[in-house]
C-alpha cells in the first residue's frame, strides 16, 4: 500500500492491524534488541542469552531476546558460525555471541539493501547479491547436503519451526 506520505510492505506478516500509539509502545517494549537499529545494545541481548539454558536456535526466534530474526536467518547464521542449534545459550562464549551479533547485523543489512534474504558470501558465489539465484543466496536452509563436508543436512523441529543443520560441521 502506498499513500501520499507512507508506504507499507505487507509481504510476509501473518497479521496486520492499525493500532494506537499506546499499543505500539506496549508491543515495542516486549521486543528484544534489533540488530538493525543504531541504538541497539547487544549487551542486553547477551545478558538474556548467557543466562538461558534454552537452545540458541530457540532463543534466536524469541523476539523478546533479539528482534527480527526469522527461521532462514536462524539456520544460516548458526551454520555460518558452526554453532549447533540445540546448544544452550549459556554455553556460548562472549566472543561467539559478539561474532553472532556482528554476522547477524551484516546478514540483515544485506537483506534490507537487496530486499531479499542473502546469507551466503557474494564474493564466494562470484555474483552480487541482486544477481544470485535463490539456491545460491542461502547456506544451509532447505539444503540437501552440506556445502563444506557433503554430509546430508539434518532437519527437525526446534522452537516450533523446522531447523536445518549439518551435524558434522556444527557442534
Show which residues each predicted segment covers.
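Structured catalytic/nucleic-acid-binding cores of DNA maintenance enzymes
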Residues: 1-171
Amino acid at each position: 500500500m502506498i499513500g501520499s506520505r507512507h508506504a507499507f510492505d505487507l509481504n510476509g506478516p501473518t497479521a496486520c492491524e492499525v493500532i494506537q500509539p499506546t499499543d505500539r509502545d506496549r508491543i515495542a517494549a516486549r521486543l528484544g534488541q534489533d540488530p538493525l537499529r543504531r541504538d541497539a545494545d547487544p549487551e542486553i541481548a547477551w545478558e538474556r542469552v548467557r543466562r538461558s539454558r534454552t537452545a540458541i536456535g530457540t532463543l534466536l526466534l524469541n523476539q523478546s531476546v533479539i528482534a527480527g530474526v526469522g527461521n532462514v536467518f536462524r539456520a544460516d547464521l548458526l551454520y555460518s558460525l558452526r554453532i549447533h542449534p540445540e546448544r544452550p545459550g549459556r554455553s556460548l562464549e562472549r566472543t561467539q555471541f559478539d561474532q553472532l551479533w556482528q554476522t547477524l547485523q551484516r546478514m540483515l543489512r544485506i537483506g534490507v539493501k537487496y530486499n531479499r534474504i542473502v546469507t551466503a558470501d557474494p564474493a564466494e558465489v562470484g555474483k552480487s547479491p541482486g544477481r544470485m539465484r535463490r539456491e545460491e543466496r542461502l547456506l544451509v536452509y532447505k539444503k540437501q547436503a552440506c556445502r563444506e563436508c557433503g554430509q546430508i543436512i539434518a532437519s527437525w523441529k526446534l522452537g516450533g519451526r523446522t531447523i536445518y543443520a549439518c551435524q558434522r560441521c556444527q557442534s
